[in-house]
Amino acid sequence: MLRFAPSPTGDMHIGNLRAAIFNYIVAKQQHKPFLIRIEDTDKERNIEGKDQEILEILKLMGISWDKLVYQSRNIDYHREMAEKLLKENKAFYCYASTEFLEREKEKAKNEKRPFRYLDEWAALEKDKHHAPVVRLKAPNHAVSFNDAIKKEVEFEPYELDSFVLLRKDKSPTYNFACACDDLLYEISLIIRGEDHVSNTPKQILIQQALGSNNPIVYAHLPIILDETSGKKMSKRDEVSSVKWLLNQGFLPEAIVNYLITIGNKVPKEVFSLDEAIEWFDLENLSSSPAHFNLKYLKHLNHEHLKLLDDEKLLELILIKDKNLLGLLRLFIEECGTLLELKEKISLFLEPKDIVKTYENEDFKERCLVLFNALKSMDFQAYKDFESFKKEAMRLSQLKGKDFFKPLRILLTGNSHGVELPLIFPYIQSHHQKVLRLKA
């Protein structure tokens, strides 16, 4: 079984979605079940409703699952596993207070050495009746694993101390809950971000202590860097939020296409998730950081906009008039996102606001002169744009750019865009909506 294990503590990050996509693809390729595990044991950081938001985003991206579990419902199992390790003398109670440990950390910082927990501290404050934590005994050997992307990774004994499994309130730590659940659900491969590399040896040690004979294969994805700063994309960067991208008018299909593409060798530029399942290979992923490029994502989104069928296009733009489909297709050629497309069609159909938009009084006057001329014309009476244009010029007595710029603005709401002869048939059929001015 493969899994994706998000925490409901904030908006889904593009790095998390990328991991979800890759786990889903490999599960499909290997004909294995796919598990979604909501890691909700951190009650203080959980945000109500974020779990459902995550699931909705996954559905939008075309990702389905065979099993959905909430980690918090396995706490009794986690405590049972901790008790097992205590009985087998693989774990121990530690009574050291938070204050004591903070003092030791400060001392290490002042002495410019890494902090390392010492087992001899475990019973120092036992007589003070502190609630104890449970710690796994530190290894006396190196921990190594063969990462599918990073290749051989090794941690020396001095890099791993006796770390906490259960907190004072008997709640499991992230690494303990994660390792226990991966055993419970027989997870065979984990694809996740490289920020988890330091967690991996701890989870391996926990599983070994619990008697696991089926080592998990790990693949740690390189981080995604910001295209301008070159720094790791933070959750605070709005562009790193999947929700933000969707709200900006990026199609789920384009986001999936892009996240599979970056840092990867792909056989074609534009593809679907189902197509990627046919050829995706972890071996083709680069071990170097990927750079997020919003401009290229917009390009891919433009290509996916063109692939939308008529029904889906009308649904997304919230338009029921099928007679506008041809116009939408023309506008798509100039748009990178749904938001841009919606704006173009809205400007076309809504009353034009020349008073608020343009400061030049002479220009506004020309617009009004032309508007009155156009209002007197029967749009349906003209066989083509050329004959319509000549009559409008005659009636308004305007010519050159004094005519064409006001004309485009009055008919489309934009000072530039698709050639007017191409959209004239749609202007004719919708002229009563098109030719309106805001009061």
UniProtKB/Swiss-Prot annotation:
Q: From which source organism is this entry?
A: Helicobacter pylori (strain Shi470)
Q: How does it assemble?
A: Monomer.
Query: Could you tell me the EC number(s) of this protein?
Result: 6.1.1.17
Q: What does this protein do?
A: Catalyzes the attachment of glutamate to tRNA(Glu) in a two-step reaction: glutamate is first activated by ATP to form Glu-AMP and then transferred to the acceptor end of tRNA(Glu).
Q: Which GO terms describe its cellular component?
A: cytosol
Q: Where in the cell is it found?
A: Cytoplasm
**Stated family:** Belongs to the class-I aminoacyl-tRNA synthetase family. Glutamate--tRNA ligase type 1 subfamily.
Keyword field = Aminoacyl-tRNA synthetase, ATP-binding, Cytoplasm, Ligase, Nucleotide-binding, Protein biosynthesis
InterPro entries of this UniProt entry? Answer: aa-tRNA-synth_I_cd-bd (IPR045462), aa-tRNA-synth_I_codon-bd_sub2 (IPR020751), aa-tRNA-synth_I_CS (IPR001412), aa_tRNA-synth_I_cd-bd_sf (IPR008925), Glu-tRNA-ligase_bac/mito (IPR004527), Glu/Gln-tRNA-synth (IPR000924), Glu/Gln-tRNA-synth_Ib_cat-dom (IPR020058), GluQ/Sye (IPR049940)
Q: Name one Pfam family in it.
A: tRNA-synt_1c
Can you state which reaction this protein catalyses?
Answer: tRNA(Glu) + L-glutamate + ATP = L-glutamyl-tRNA(Glu) + AMP + diphosphate
Which amino acid positions bind ATP, per UniProt? 235
Output this protein's name. Answer: Glutamate--tRNA ligase 2
- Coiled coil, from the record: none
What are the GO MF terms of this UniProt record? ATP binding; glutamate-tRNA ligase activity; tRNA binding
Q: Name one GO biological process term.
A: glutamyl-tRNA aminoacylation
Q: Which Gene3D superfamilies match?
A: 1.10.10.350, HUPs
Q: Which domain of life is it from?
A: Bacteria
